[in-house]
Amino acid sequence: MVLIKEFRVVLPCSVQEYQVGQLYSVAEASKNETGGGEGIEVLKNEPYEKDGEKGQYTHKIYHLKSKVPAFVRMIAPEGSLVFHEKAWNAYPYCRTIVTNEYMKDDFFIKIETWHKPDLGTLENVHGLDPNTWKTVEIVHIDIADRSQVEPADYKADEDPALFQSVKTKRGPLGPNWKKELANNPDCPQMCAYKLVTIKFKWWGLQSKVENFIQKQEKRIFTNFHRQLFCWIDKWIDLTMEDIRRMEDETQKELETMRKKGSVRGTSAADV
């Protein structure tokens, strides 16, 4: 058995703008989660071409310990809380696979994302067979809804309900911002359709861990896209060449940060 959910995140930006904004925000967010022996190590970041698909391939290692729940830490052997993330970014389609060498075939997280120029109204954009699609829970994430944010995660300067972009004049996003966006021909719109498939085969813990991971994915998607929108003035003028240069610099920074300082960012204890 696997647990599948589709998260839909609507944003007041275009699919083209989001490509730069996403990569900028991933680099920044990675630095916020790295330090004290934990965090993200980038092994590869290079172009790929396979079976007619072209894009950017990344291979990252996540060194975790405080970022997993206590009931997993208690039974996990030393060194087992290391996860490999391989991603194929053939934008506007992206596929990410997370694995763990200790659990091998008994664990994976697969995140498949389509970025579409709409307001999250398309059904089954990932083309699942009808029987599988019937089992998928659809979760709508509203980046301006503070009630969807964990209290420990809230930051006023990353709140789309308060933020207004100087460069684009977008925001602040009120309670009816999606309806207003639908009726505003001057503002672009898009939706990230993120299909998350989780397998965790460990007797007695399977449903508990699968539900924990899905909850964490929703938390990550919510916080990340709130940041992305509130950082728009920092990335809206960047080119893909700027992004690749920034990624190279971030890779070196992460290696230094991970080896020193204290643990930073999201911890499972906050959940």
From Swiss-Prot:
<dbReference type="GO" id="GO:0008526">
    <property type="term" value="F:phosphatidylinositol transfer activity"/>
</dbReference>
<keyword id="KW-0813">Transport</keyword>
<comment type="function">
    <text>Catalyzes the transfer of phosphatidylinositol, phosphatidylcholine and sphingomyelin between membranes. Required for COPI-mediated retrograde transport from the Golgi to the endoplasmic reticulum; phosphatidylinositol and phosphatidylcholine transfer activity is essential for this function.</text>
</comment>
<dbReference type="GO" id="GO:0006890">
    <property type="term" value="P:retrograde vesicle-mediated transport, Golgi to endoplasmic reticulum"/>
</dbReference>
<dbReference type="InterPro" id="IPR023393">
    <property type="entry name" value="START-like_dom_sf"/>
</dbReference>
<dbReference type="GO" id="GO:0008525">
    <property type="term" value="F:phosphatidylcholine transporter activity"/>
</dbReference>
<dbReference type="GO" id="GO:0120019">
    <property type="term" value="F:phosphatidylcholine transfer activity"/>
</dbReference>
<keyword id="KW-0333">Golgi apparatus</keyword>
<keyword id="KW-0597">Phosphoprotein</keyword>
<dbReference type="InterPro" id="IPR055261">
    <property type="entry name" value="PI_transfer_N"/>
</dbReference>
<keyword id="KW-0472">Membrane</keyword>
<dbReference type="GO" id="GO:0005794">
    <property type="term" value="C:Golgi apparatus"/>
</dbReference>
<protein>
    <recommendedName>
        <fullName>Phosphatidylinositol transfer protein beta isoform</fullName>
    </recommendedName>
</protein>
<dbReference type="GO" id="GO:0031210">
    <property type="term" value="F:phosphatidylcholine binding"/>
</dbReference>
<dbReference type="Pfam" id="PF02121">
    <property type="entry name" value="IP_trans"/>
</dbReference>
<keyword id="KW-0445">Lipid transport</keyword>
<feature type="modified residue" description="Phosphoserine">
    <location>
        <position position="262"/>
    </location>
</feature>
<keyword id="KW-0007">Acetylation</keyword>
<dbReference type="InterPro" id="IPR001666">
    <property type="entry name" value="PI_transfer"/>
</dbReference>
<dbReference type="GO" id="GO:0005737">
    <property type="term" value="C:cytoplasm"/>
</dbReference>
<dbReference type="GO" id="GO:0140338">
    <property type="term" value="F:sphingomyelin transfer activity"/>
</dbReference>
<feature type="modified residue" description="N6-acetyllysine">
    <location>
        <position position="215"/>
    </location>
</feature>
<dbReference type="GO" id="GO:0000139">
    <property type="term" value="C:Golgi membrane"/>
</dbReference>
<dbReference type="GO" id="GO:0005789">
    <property type="term" value="C:endoplasmic reticulum membrane"/>
</dbReference>
<comment type="similarity">
    <text>Belongs to the PtdIns transfer protein family. PI transfer class I subfamily.</text>
</comment>
<keyword id="KW-0256">Endoplasmic reticulum</keyword>
<dbReference type="GO" id="GO:0035091">
    <property type="term" value="F:phosphatidylinositol binding"/>
</dbReference>
<keyword id="KW-0446">Lipid-binding</keyword>
